Amino acid sequence: MPELPEVEIIRRGIEPWVVGHIIQRAEIRNNQLRWPIDQEIISIHQRRVISLKRRAKYLLMQLHHGWIIIHFGMSGRLRILAHMLPPEKHDHIDLIMSNNCILRYTDPRRFGAWLWSNNLDKMSILNNLGVEPLSDQFDGHWLFTKSRNKSLLIKQFLMTNKLVVGIGNIYANEALFAAGILPSRASCSLKEQEALLLARSIKAILLSSIEEGGTTLRDFLQSDGRDGLFAKKLQVYGRHGEPCYTCGEFIQIAKYGQRSSFFCPSCQN
């Protein structure tokens, strides 16, 4: 599933090709994604894109009369085509742009969504989202304060979107390793210095992934079709039974909240 870094990479990749340009029309080949595509998107005609923003794992495309809200689900991706190519089986949506490029949405599992809103403030899926981990608001003090009365395991805390958005399983594992904290620790057990280090680690891991083009494990590709290279920097995620690069101890795996957690029993405590 694309997490915050992957969605931000897609946003940056397609922004120069769509912002300031006009959507001439949409070609919808499959209306049945996670939810049916709104008629406003299906019938879009000659509408200029004003801005392209990201909130959590949502892309927000602003037009003069409303917003297209895109969520990538498990396997969705967007790419820019310099000219029309024959669509393949899972190419469900094209936005035909005035600059002769095509914005193509591909989603093999069809868990993604294309939604429409006249007013983002009234979108319930956005209203209950937590703090952005790359914002100034998110820091060690915030993390320490918010975790005081939480019985959640720290890994689950980091993946609760009502608290903090977009970190996801891969980056939660990597950040906890970087901070030397076991995923099974109760969030309320964090000491203030641990919270400061964890917040810094989260920011550093997310920014590093963005710089490397994200993490390609299965479906994710950048908007130009390239793989993300952060997978080569993973320290614990997906490395069960392999030696830790730092200490040589074998990476272990456990399930908390039905999600796999990878950790080094020596480097993390």
From Swiss-Prot:
Q: Which one of the record's GO molecular function terms can you name? A: 8-oxo-7,8-dihydroguanine DNA N-glycosylase activity
What is the top-level taxon of the source organism? Answer: Bacteria
The UniProt keywords, alphabetically, are: DNA damage, DNA repair, DNA-binding, Glycosidase, Hydrolase, Lyase, Metal-binding, Multifunctional enzyme, Zinc, Zinc-finger
* Ranges in a coiled coil: none
Query: Which SUPFAM superfamilies does UniProt cross-reference here?
Result: Glucocorticoid receptor-like (DNA-binding domain), N-terminal domain of MutM-like DNA repair proteins, S13-like H2TH domain
- Kindly state what the record says about how the cofactor is bound: Binds 1 zinc ion per subunit.
Q: How the protein assembles, per its UniProt entry? A: Monomer.
Job description of the protein: Involved in base excision repair of DNA damaged by oxidation or by mutagenic agents. Acts as a DNA glycosylase that recognizes and removes damaged bases. Has a preference for oxidized purines, such as 7,8-dihydro-8-oxoguanine (8-oxoG). Has AP (apurinic/apyrimidinic) lyase activity and introduces nicks in the DNA strand. Cleaves the DNA backbone by beta-delta elimination to generate a single-strand break at the site of the removed base with both 3'- and 5'-phosphates.
**Per the similarity annotation, which family is this?**
Belongs to the FPG family.
Q: What is this protein called?
A: Formamidopyrimidine-DNA glycosylase
